[in-house]
Swiss-Prot record:
The lineage of its organism: Bacteria, Bacillati, Bacillota, Bacilli, Bacillales. Belongs to the alpha-ketoglutarate dehydrogenase family. GO terms for biological process: glycolytic process; tricarboxylic acid cycle. It comes from the Bacteria. Homodimer. Part of the 2-oxoglutarate dehydrogenase (OGDH) complex composed of E1 (2-oxoglutarate dehydrogenase), E2 (dihydrolipoamide succinyltransferase) and E3 (dihydrolipoamide dehydrogenase); the complex contains multiple copies of the three enzymatic components (E1, E2 and E3). This is 2-oxoglutarate dehydrogenase E1 component. Disulfide bonds: none annotated. SMART domains: Transket_pyr (SM00861). GO terms for molecular function: oxoglutarate dehydrogenase (succinyl-transferring) activity; thiamine pyrophosphate binding.
Length: 951
């Protein structure tokens, strides 16, 4: 590029010294054209005389203008681009003042005559036409930036993005010409949208539907977005949205038949209404959900290829579905068929997230999810965000729900371009949607549309908004719907007559009535019945691995490229893993996990692991991704495993629980063939993602038929580290346990961990699959009593319970059966090993799989001890926490109240653990002492000499 082009390019973005340099060259050219280089001379030759707005004005013989005026004009043009949104016509109700005075020429000490004298090309590369004046440019940019679309780009750092968007909009991308057929089709879409809502309103009086009315243009907007994304190569389009307008989007964007929606209003059977060709996938859970939470998975043929459209199931917890949808999309983009890390293909899938104007700035999960946009493990090649902005949140005005000008402002921190669009201009909405699809295809980055409309009725159809928002709703009642606004526009343009409008609307109403007539009159059966596979639970699975093969895997896991420098301390740790296969060797927790992953990959199952510090592991136990000490280059032996038939991906996550767990859940729901694991840094922090556990993971299948095999690793155990680094709050997951909705395990050996991971991988894709929560250890990671010999991996499988070796051998003498789980079992085992007293009066049983409760296995153990007088549950958590409240009634049921069931552990507390290490040690010692002490044996069923409940 020549010198003058560079100078001119700078003049567009800056004023002051750079522009002064241009003027200096120009004045030099005027005095002596030969004094500037040839290219610059040609450039100035093209200016000629500036065009005038009236034919009577006489053009001057050569360019002549005032430097100060050019500087002011440059500032004016830049300000229109940067701040035109403040003067834009983006509010359908006209209830926000337009700051049009910002661009009054007098504020810049300019007149129209001044602008006529300045060539537009001096101020912009994208002048409206050759030889245009600055006045024409000024008027053109006002049309572009202060019309029914407002654009915010000032916060973008990437100049290429800025310039591309500006060039597109200034060259007419938002002022597209629609053909007559396109305009009529657009009207038809608006009519379908509104008349659907009207039909529901009249037919199902008083039922909630969370109408789209006031934001009707969202439907053609989504139509155009979906079409644009498909044109860019997307084969999967995943949509997340809340309840507002959801039924309309289901009907018109996803193609859910009207009759199915009407059946849900009437509580009639609707399974037989699914199209016979199976193009619509609707999974029914056994307990179900309200109609405006349900999703849809539809395969369509568009542009001569099959495309999968998915609207994610959604709870009432606003915005949390966003990260779940991002997980869907990443799973659709990733190729997991080969060894190595999964290979991402951005163009294969795309996300559209529809937000509420109050929820977008109000819910922290939004920022968590936006933060993922450029992260290697979580990016999805550009998410399209749409704020369904009806300028109210239930009854709350914007000035009470956010501290910023726009609902979209939080997106600016992530350098996301923002388009504000007036929902009463459907053609502008469609034009923006097309431009956004092109942007996503080119830059693979997030982009946002703030679709500004209103809410025709209250928050729901039984709500009276005049009580809380009288001024707003007076304006809404007097405002025509976009269907009528656009129809009047088409009539004025001569595109459509009133009769043609009436015919279109009549056909739509007839279709709605015909669909209503298909709905059965009887109500559906309300019985809740679990599927047989869920009711029966997991079958017995052989998870052992042949010793020769396991040895081969171990050897390969200890190989890395020649010259790769492993940190010397880590080198010693890894070398010990080779010795574990020698006679008498033992395998620790981290080693067992790596072997499990290697064997699972060899079986052809992809593995994905993410969490805070998961490459190394919070406690330096994993080291599954190695870092060269000189170059920092990363290497994982699992990527080069010769027997691997699928991908292995591990990512250190951002410091977020909710969004990351939601992402991994979504990934697994979409890619049910993949073993997906999420690891909390400490189990204590998992409650930051409680919505994901409560609304999605524990209940998703019962509500929506949404299967998942997600594994959640929650470090848990009392080691004197205080109340925030001790408890994963096991009690919460057990409270949520029911209908075999997930597995809750607290393991005591490396081999058990190996086998339960392999069992989970084996069950992926089967009807019995369920999520799994593992209370993973901290101090046990390298504890000798938690290690396992090679034979435990090659000759055994997972055991729901494990009996303490060396105890309970004389069945006649056993009076006490001690049940415990996880670290408590190892603490007791350690004490048993050190004890010099006879412990033949007791036996210890480790409950490894707490839920589903291993009734048969525990009953078998109890039946072997005819003289047992009591069962004791021992835990390190307080009595109101941990497993006790879950375990007690189940143990009593197993014993049919024949034995006394009692508790040893910490008393009821409000905080889970002591902050004082000394106090912790004293409590831990007391628990162990009482568990192993003969002095507190129960005197018989229903009575106990044990001290009163330590309340």
């Amino acid at each position: 590029m020549g010198e003058s082009s560079n100078v001119h390019e700078k003049s567009q973005a800056f004023y002051g010294p750079n522009l002064g340099y241009i003027i200096e060259l120009y004045e030099q050219y005027l005095e002596d054209p030969s004094s500037v280089d040839e290219e610059t001379r040609r450039y100035f030759d093209e200016f000629g005389a500036p065009e005038t707005s009236t034919p009577t004005e006489v053009p001057v013989s050569g360019p002549s203008f005032d430097l100060e005026k050019v500087v002011s004009a440059t500032r004016l043009i830049n300000d229109i681009r940067a701040f035109g949104h403040k003067a834009a016509d983006i509010y359908p109700l006209k209830d926000h003042p337009r700051e049009q005075e910002l661009f009054e020429l007098s504020r810049y000490d300019l007149t129209e005559e001044d602008l006529k004298q300045i060539p537009a090309r001096l101020l912009s590369d994208d002048a409206p036409k050759p030889n245009a004046s600055a006045l024409e440019l000024f008027r053109h940019l006002l049309d572009v930036y202060t019309g029914t679309v407002a654009i915010e780009l000032r916060h973008l750092d990437d100049m290429e993005e800025k310039k591309w968007i500006r060039r597109q909009v200034e060259q007419g991308a938002l002022q597209q010409t629609f053909s007559k057929e396109e305009k009529i089709e657009l009207f038809k879409r608006l009519a379908e949208t509104e008349l659907f809502e009207s039909f529901l309103h009249k037919t199902y009086v008083g039922q909630k539907r969370f109408s789209i009315e006031g934001l009707d243009a969202m439907v053609p907007l989504l139509d155009a977005m979906v079409g644009g994304l498909i044109s860019s190569g997307s084969e999967h389009i995943n949509i997340g949205m809340a309840h507002r307008g959801r039924l309309n989007v289901l009907a018109h964007v996803l193609g859910k038949p009207y009759e199915m929606i009407f059946a849900e209003f009437q509580h009639a059977p609707n399974k037989e209404l699914i199209p016979s060709e199976g193009s619509i996938g609707i999974n029914f859970g056994w307990s179900g959900d309200v109609k405006y939470h349900l999703g849809l998975d539809r395969k369509v043929v568009e542009q001569q290829k099959e495309v999968r459209l998915n609207l994610a199931n959604n709870p009432s917890h606003l915005e949390f579905v966003g990260s779940v949808v991002e997980g869907y999309t990443r799973a659709a983009q990733d190729d997991r068929s080969e060894k190595g890390s999964a290979v991402q293909h951005d163009d294969l899938a795309a996300s559209i997230l529809i937000h509420g104007d109050a929820a977008f700035p109000g819910q922290g999960i939004v920022a968590e999810t936006l933060n993922m946009t450029n992260l290697t493990g979580y990016r999805t090649g550009g998410t399209v965000h749409v704020i369904a902005n009806n300028t109210i949140g239930f009854t709350t005005d914007p000035n009470d729900s956010r501290s910023t000008r726009y609902a979209s402002d939080i997106a600016k921190g992530y350098e996301i371009p923002v388009f504000h669009v007036n929902a009463d201009d459907p053609e502008a909405c469609v034009a923006v949607a097309k431009l956004i699809s092109e942007y996503r295809a080119k830059f693979h980055k997030d982009i946002l549309v703030d679709l500004i409309g209103y809410r025709r009725y209250g928050h729901n159809e039984m709500d009276e908004p005049m009580n809380t928002n009288p001024v707003l709703y007076k304006a809404i009642k007097g405002h025509q719907s976009v269907r009528h606004v656009y129809a009047a526009r088409l009539e004025e343009e001569g595109v459509m007559t009133k009769d043609e409008k009436a015919q279109i609307e009549q056909k739509i109403e007839e279709a709605l009535k015909a669909a209503r007539d298909l709905v059965p009159s009887e109500e559906e059966d309300a019985d809740i019945v679990l599927p047989d596979a869920v009711h029966k639970g997991f079958p017995k699975v052989d998870t052992s691995v042949e010793r020769e093969f396991l040895t081969q895997l171990n050897e390969e896991l200890l190989n890395w490229p020649e010259g790769f420098g492993v940190f010397h301390k880590l080198q010693k740790v890894l070398d010990r893993r080779r010795d574990a296969f020698s006679e008498g060797g033992k395998i620790d927790w981290g080693h067992a996990e790596t072997l499990a992953f290697a064997s699972i990959l060899s079986d052809g199952t992809p593995v994905r692991l993410s969490g805070q510090d998961s490459e190394r592991g919070t406690f330096a136990q994993r080291n599954i991704m190695l870092n060269d000490v000189e170059s920092g280059k990363k290497f994982s032996p699992l990527h080069e495993l010769s027997t691997a038939k699928a991908s292995f991906s591990v990512y250190n996550s951002p410091l977020s629980e909710g969004s990351v767990l939601g992402f991994e859940y979504g990934y697994n729901v979409f890619a049910q063939d993949t073993l997906v694991l999420w690891e909390a840094q400490y189990g204590d922090f998992a409650n930051s993602a409680q919505v994901m556990f409560d609304q999605f993971i524990s209940a998703g299948r019962a509500k929506w038929g949404q299967k998942s095999g997600l594994v959640m690793l929650l470090p848990h155990g009392y080691e004197g580290q205080g109340p925030e680094h001790s408890s994963a709050r096991m009690e919460r997951y057990l409270t949520l346990a029911g209908e075999k909705n997930w597995t809750v395990a607290n393991l005591s050996s490396a081999a058990q961990y190996f086998h339960i991971l392999r069992r989970q991988a084996e069950m992926l894709g089967k009807e019995e699959i369920r999520p799994m929560i593992i209370m993973t250890p901290k101090s046990l990671l390298r504890h000798p009593l938690a290690t396992s010999p090679v034979e435990a991996f090659t000759e055994e499988s997972f055991k729901p319970i494990v009996e303490q070796p060396g105890l309970g051998e004389n069945t006649e003498k056993v009076e006490r059966l001690v049940f415990c789980t996880g670290k408590m079992a190892i603490d007791l085992a350690e004490a048993v090993g050190k004890s010099e007293e006879s412990l033949d009066f007791l036996h210890i049983v480790r409950v490894e799989e707490i839920y589903p409760f291993p009734v048969r296995e525990i009953r078998d153990v109890i039946s072997r001890y005819p003289n047992a007088r009591e069962i004791v549950w021992v835990q390190e958590e307080p009595k109101n926490m941990g497993a006790w409240t879950y375990i007690e009634p189940r143990l009593e049921a197993v014993t049919t109240n024949r034995l006394d069931v009692r508790y040893i552990g910490r008393r009821r507390r409000s905080s889970p653990a002591e902050g004082n290490p000394t106090a912790h040690k004293q409590e831990q010692a007391r628990i162990i002492r009482e568990a192993l002490s003969r002095d507190v044996v129960s005197s018989g069923a229903g009575t106990s000499t044990y001290q009163k409940d330590r309340k």
